[in-house]
Amino acid sequence: GDRRHGYGGFNYQPRFWQPVIPTFEKHWGLSAISSVLDVGCAKGFMLHDLAAHIPGITVRGVDVSAYAIAHAMESVQAHLQVADAQSLPFADRSFDVVISINTVHNLEREACGRALQEIQRVSRGQAFVTVDAYRNERERERMMAWNLTAKTILSVDEWVQFFEEVGYRGDYFWFIP
């Protein structure tokens, strides 16, 4: 799609998720009877690779972008839906693992907190988020110049405190510019 949708040149690249999926499988003990939700799934690339690596696994994805879902990978499109991370359309404890990669920091702080609470609510205890973070002023300046979509901009220590404040108990990692 073109840049006005934010997905210009956003195409499937096997090198991104295929090397990571076996680590997910081992860390969370994923198998054909597992269920995984991707919050901020975009076009479903990670879920495609997950389903290809673990046949039979239940995958679901949500994204706020109708454009992304409409242009998702055919192999997983039926398992994706437009939804807001602040109000996930699933019952409590619906998924073995809930993953959200570089998504929640794009929400304002209060909304980000609600999204993290929703991730916690629909998981059966295992979750993983990545967020942009910084450790010093130089990294903060780089992040401000580079990530134009992030609305919750915190240091590593501030993120840890924020996770605790909102009750998010899953795993987490940072992208540091």
Question: Across the structure, where does each feature detected by a protein language model lie?
Answer:
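Class I (Rossmann-like) S-adenosyl-L-methionine-dependent methyltransferase catalytic domain
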Residues: 1-89, 107-114, 118, 122-177
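Hydrophobic adenine-recognition pocket in adenosine-nucleotide-binding enzymes
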Residues: 103
